[in-house]
């Protein structure tokens, strides 16, 4: 994607606020507690909720671990990334990783999107995302949109222009139960992409709230229901 427009589906309505809330839960709160997500009126992780109320050592848990050394102290992956992008932009090590082999068995679900790599070149922030697995009906539209939002957020708080956005998928698939509705979706009219407004006053990554995002002129087809595969 060249980022001339926001990558969001128009052939059906995407629950874009839910996608951003999940992003904030993982990247900003660095939480694995499903109750934190429920407080945002989001329930997409409820069926993976364990007895302790969490999804185990997955997603936000990995980002919140203080395992990087910075100025004599330990910080987590997100804080390290933000610092390095600002202070060492030419580094080829701007990477976050959710795939921790030592803790995969402690995760309610192994991460689908597991890695980001960031590049700064000529004042622009580029992002490459890697997903081991993406179902095209549900997971892909969510992930492609929300990580593009993340790129825009981090570009804003680090002071860079928006660069290219790459989303790599190892295993891209369609579930049999989704085929009929996907055929309907494929026949639908596509509309021009909306404009994503992000509050320009926010300069700290941890100050973003859902109220700092607006989709302007989001024209889309009717909602299509797809059963969540478990």
Swiss-Prot record:
Binding-site residues, dUMP: 92-93, 132-135, 143, 173-175
Pathway terms, separated by semicolons: Pyrimidine metabolism; dTTP biosynthesis
Subcellular location field: Cytoplasm
Record gene name: thyA1
Chain residues that bind (6R)-5,10-methylene-5,6,7,8-tetrahydrofolate: 135
Enzyme class, first EC level, given as a word: transferase
Task performed by this protein: Catalyzes the reductive methylation of 2'-deoxyuridine-5'-monophosphate (dUMP) to 2'-deoxythymidine-5'-monophosphate (dTMP) while utilizing 5,10-methylenetetrahydrofolate (mTHF) as the methyl donor and reductant in the reaction, yielding dihydrofolate (DHF) as a by-product. This enzymatic reaction provides an intracellular de novo source of dTMP, an essential precursor for DNA biosynthesis.
Reaction catalysed by this enzyme: dUMP + (6R)-5,10-methylene-5,6,7,8-tetrahydrofolate = 7,8-dihydrofolate + dTMP
Enzyme Commission no: 2.1.1.45
GO cellular component, one term: cytosol
Quaternary structure annotation from Swiss-Prot or TrEMBL: Homodimer.
Source lineage: Bacteria, Bacillati, Bacillota, Bacilli, Bacillales
Stated name of the protein: Thymidylate synthase 1
Source species of the chain: Bacillus amyloliquefaciens
Keyword entries, A-Z: Cytoplasm, Methyltransferase, Nucleotide biosynthesis, Transferase
UniProt keyword Transferase, yes or no: yes
Family: Belongs to the thymidylate synthase family. Bacterial-type ThyA subfamily.
């Amino acid at each position: 994607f060249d980022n001339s427009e926001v990558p969001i589906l128009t052939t059906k309505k995407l629950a874009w606020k839910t996608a951003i809330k999940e992003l904030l839960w993982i990247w900003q709160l660095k939480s694995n507690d499903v109750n934190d997500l429920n407080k945002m009126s989001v329930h997409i992780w409820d069926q993976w909720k364990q007895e302790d109320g969490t999804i185990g050592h997955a997603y936000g848990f990995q980002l919140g671990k203080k395992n990087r050394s910075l100025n004599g102290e330990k910080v987590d992956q997100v804080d390290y990334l933000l610092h390095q992008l600002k202070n060492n932009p030419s580094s080829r090590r701007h990477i976050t990783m959710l795939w921790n082999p030592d803790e995969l068995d402690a995760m309610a679900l192994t991460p689908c999107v597991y890695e980001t790599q960031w590049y700064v070149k000529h004042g622009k922030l580029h992002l490459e995302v890697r997903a081991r697995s993406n179902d095209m009906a549900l997971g892909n539209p969510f992930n492609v949109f929300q990580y593009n939002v993340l790129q825009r957020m981090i570009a804003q708080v680090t002071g860079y222009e928006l660069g290219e956005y790459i989303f790599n998928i190892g295993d891209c698939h369609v579930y049999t139960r989704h085929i009929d509705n996907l055929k309907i979706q494929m026949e639908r009219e596509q509309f021009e992409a909306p404009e994503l407004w992000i509050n320009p006053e926010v300069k700290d990554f941890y100050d973003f709230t859902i109220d700092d995002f607006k989709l302007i002129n989001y024209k889309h087809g009717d909602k299509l229901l797809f059963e969540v595969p478990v």
